[in-house]
Curated annotation (Swiss-Prot):
Disulfide bonds: none
Species assigned in the record: Parasynechococcus marenigrum (strain WH8102)
Matching Pfam families: SfsA, SfsA_N
The protein's name: Sugar fermentation stimulation protein homolog
Family the entry assigns: Belongs to the SfsA family.
Gene name of the encoded protein: sfsA
Domain of life of the source: Bacteria
Taxonomic placement: Bacteria, Bacillati, Cyanobacteriota, Cyanophyceae, Synechococcales
Annotated NCBIfam families: sfsA (TIGR00230)
GO molecular function terms listed in the Swiss-Prot or TrEMBL record: DNA binding
InterPro entries linked to this entry: SfsA (IPR005224), SfsA_C (IPR040452), SfsA_N (IPR041465)
Length: 254
């Protein structure tokens, strides 16, 4: 753990992404994009949701180019530019395969040490819940020096929908998300349960459940908090060559 305390610290760095303009998204997993060279390509869209508020044909997008014999498509759509809460352009991370890796890097950098305490190990996709039929995103084992020796079950949710400066999850009905809340409550009190909304845009100042999209999720969210589930909304800034830590944001008063 290196001790990540300064907002703006780079957590992930990568080769600069290629920029283009979105033509259309279709069949959920596909997006046609015109690159800056004028070439039109089809990219993989690693986001199964409706992408409410961040899907705008004609918007600027950023893509990762990773050709491989094992991949049907050489391009992956990573980021989208949208009008931010203040009207200025804002880049949003739309690849839902990334947040688990990003939150793991956040923990390993020590950015959540004050909230989680010292962590000895991190395991991903560990079976848990009823009949071990679900998998927790991250299972953390505290060090011997951690004041709370309970294992930490941590669920990550990519969050891109907003209402003004409030980040909202979910943006559609999610029975899977409802189930995750129930299962997080199920590990209490012998373990800690932590929900981490990954706020994948820098223009938000707080987090709240997306009640208008999924009222049942909102009800379960409130039950989970009362039961002892911890919520740590983590905000990030997405750039062409990396992702930067911007700190924890508060939960909106419910």
């Amino acid at each position: 753990m290196t001790g990540c305390t300064t907002p703006g610290d780079a957590l992930l760095s990568f080769e600069p992404l290629e920029e283009g303009v979105l033509i259309k998204r279709y069949k959920r997993f596909l997006a046609d994009v015109e690159l800056s060279s004028g070439e039109v390509i089809t990219a993989h869209c690693a986001n199964t949701g409706p992408m409410t508020g961040v899907l705008i044909p004609g918007q600027r997008v950023r893509l990762r180019h990773a050709p491989s014999p094992k991949r049907k498509l050489a391009w992956t759509w990573e980021q989208a530019e949208v009008p931010g809460a203040d009207g200025a352009p804002c880049w949003v991370g739309i690849n839902t395969a990334l947040p688990n890796r990003l939150i793991r890097a956040t923990i390993e950098a020590g950015c959540l040490a004050a909230q989680l305490g010292p962590i000895a190990s991190i395991r991903a996709e560990v079976a848990y819940g009823a009949n071990k039929r679900s998998r927790i995103d991250l299972l953390l084992t505290p060090t011997d020096s951690n004041p709370d020796q309970r294992p930490i079950y941590l669920e990550v949710k990519n969050t891109t929908w907003t209402d003004g400066t409030t980040a909202l999850f979910p943006d559609t009905v999610t029975e899977r998300g409802q189930k995750h809340l129930v299962e997080l409550m199920g590990v209490l009190p012998d373990s800690r349960a932590v929900l981490v909304p990954c706020l994948s845009r820098p223009d938000v100042t707080e987090f709240a459940p997306g009640d208008s999209a999924d009222p049942r999720y909102g009800e379960l969210f409130r039950e989970a908090i009362k039961a002892g589930v911890e919520v740590l909304p983590c905000r990030f800034r997405f750039q062409a060559d990396g992702i930067r830590w911007e700190g924890i944001r508060p939960l909106k008063q419910l």
